[in-house]
Amino acid sequence: MELEELGIREECGVFGCIASGEWPTQLDVPHVITLGLVGLQHRGQESAGIVTSDGSSVPTFKSHKGMGLVNHVFTEDNLKKLYVSNLGIGHTRYATTGKCELENCQPFVVETLHGKIAVAHNGELVNAARLRKKLLRHGIGLSTSSDSEMITQLLAYTPPQEQDDTPDWVARIKNLMKEAPTAYSLLIMHRDVIYAVRDPYGNRPLCIGRLIPVSDINDKEKKTSETEGWVVSSESCSFLSIGARYYREVLPGEIVEISRHNVQTLDIISRSEGNPVAFCIFEYVYFARPDSMFEDQMVYTVRYRCGQQLAIEAPVDADLVSTVPESATPAALAYAGKCGLPYVEVLCKNRYVGRTFIQPNMRLRQLGVAKKFGVLSDNFKGKRIVLVDDSIVRGNTISPIIKLLKESGAKEVHIRVASPPIKYPCFMGINIPTKEELIANKPEFDHLAEYLGANSVVYLSVEGLVSSVQEGIKFKKQKEKKHDIMIQENGNGLECFEKSGHCTACLTGKYPVELEW
């Protein structure tokens, strides 16, 4: 909850769709993409955009972008502008680099030597400053402050070995990966295909789904359904609402070509010798929707295991367990079950107080939490509460909640946090306050319970979080071939023979790559 209130947020979500079969298609591609972006709304609420194409040899790109939520940006009239399309990509954005302005809305479209490309990007380049200087030195102008535009221009820039008459997009993407090791998941649309790309460290998520007939959606045993199209998304949670089945993840370093005919791996780029995969562990903790799948496990299940581990590490004598609505609910339920305590709601959330609620005067500022939460005091008067939260960032939000509960009759309030203390900024696509703003780096952290007004405060350990995440991952036997990940076809797509790894830089200060300034 506190992550949401205090500006720790995912940068964006990407979504693409391509129709199978005969073109022009009967599939309503713009609506499919819009619904996909609605499913990714939690990943970005500042702006949204869609670019579609007819997929011809000289394609017509149609674009609509705007500030605000997906449903506000894409009205029926706006969607009509995107019709007669067979494929397209979309984007919903939060800003980590680049201002919150219309010019920074994605997808970006540029003209290249071989026609237009459209690019949607989730992540943040760790060496953006150096790449910006390099592009400017080569005479390539940049019209925005977004590092995503730099990716687009790097892709448009012809590699020295490429012949003028034959675009080699794999070479261009590999050149990008050489220039920028992390962090990005990309959708690149050119003519009649979409390229889905994940950086070699796999820091940002990306997965593929298969559009099937509506009549077959609920028949999970039917494996030979007609394929009406392919979709690719930051998270699998967006698939169900559009009638798609989860197919597989895009692997770290993988370049996938998605066409009207099939999905095929063009290449998999390895990391520097000895460097592990570094998937962002906070996708599990907070950013992803609980019904999404990463590494063959549901996010909700991981959060539940975190709650169980928290109960093992930090039990306390109490009467009930509750949560600050609502991202920590799985962890709170698990904590309660493990400790043999009842789970009871103590707060109800006012869902119509938005994230950007304006507090125009001191009285409203002082009311603070009371505007956002109602108190279910009959559930906890005279009782000892264990309140489970997903994080404590600055401490500005949880402290008023503790005060509110105690003033409403709670005998004790014990805080249990289902993730470790955040001590370091992220430079790979997550907007985290400066190191000095984080409560874990302040003198008050040594007596945090007293500072917050709680009876006790305990975080989940880093080891506990990592074990909770990795417990459910079905490791395959690792095989190597020239340092690349070996893949093979199976019934559900591709099978990866590599042990997973996770980035914990915001918790430990150990970044997967050397940072450049």
Swiss-Prot record:
Q: Which top EC class applies here?
A: transferase
Which family does the entry's similarity section mention?
In the C-terminal section; belongs to the purine/pyrimidine phosphoribosyltransferase family.
Reactions that this protein is recorded to catalyse? 5-phospho-beta-D-ribosylamine + L-glutamate + diphosphate = 5-phospho-alpha-D-ribose 1-diphosphate + L-glutamine + H2O
InterPro entries hit by this protein: GATase_2_dom (IPR017932), Ntn_hydrolases_N (IPR029055), PRibTrfase_dom (IPR000836), PRTase-like (IPR029057), PurF (IPR005854), PurF_N (IPR035584)
Which species is this UniProt entry from? Answer: Homo sapiens (Human)
The catalytic site is made up of 12 (nucleophile)
Q: How is the cofactor bound?
A: Binds 1 Mg(2+) ion per subunit.
EC number(s) for this protein?
2.4.2.14
One GO molecular-function entry: amidophosphoribosyltransferase activity
GO term, biological process aspect, one: purine nucleobase biosynthetic process
**Entry function:** Catalyzes the formation of phosphoribosylamine from phosphoribosylpyrophosphate (PRPP) and glutamine.
Q: How does it assemble?
A: Homotetramer.
The entry's protein name is Amidophosphoribosyltransferase
Q: In which tissues is it expressed?
A: Ubiquitously expressed.
| Residues reported to bind Mg(2+) | 327, 389-390
Pathway per its UniProt entry is: Purine metabolism; IMP biosynthesis via de novo pathway; N(1)-(5-phospho-D-ribosyl)glycinamide from 5-phospho-alpha-D-ribose 1-diphosphate: step 1/2
Propeptide stretch(es), residue numbers: 1-11
Q: Pinpoint the Glutamine amidotransferase type-2 domain residues.
A: 12-261
Cofactor dependency: Mg(2+); [4Fe-4S] cluster
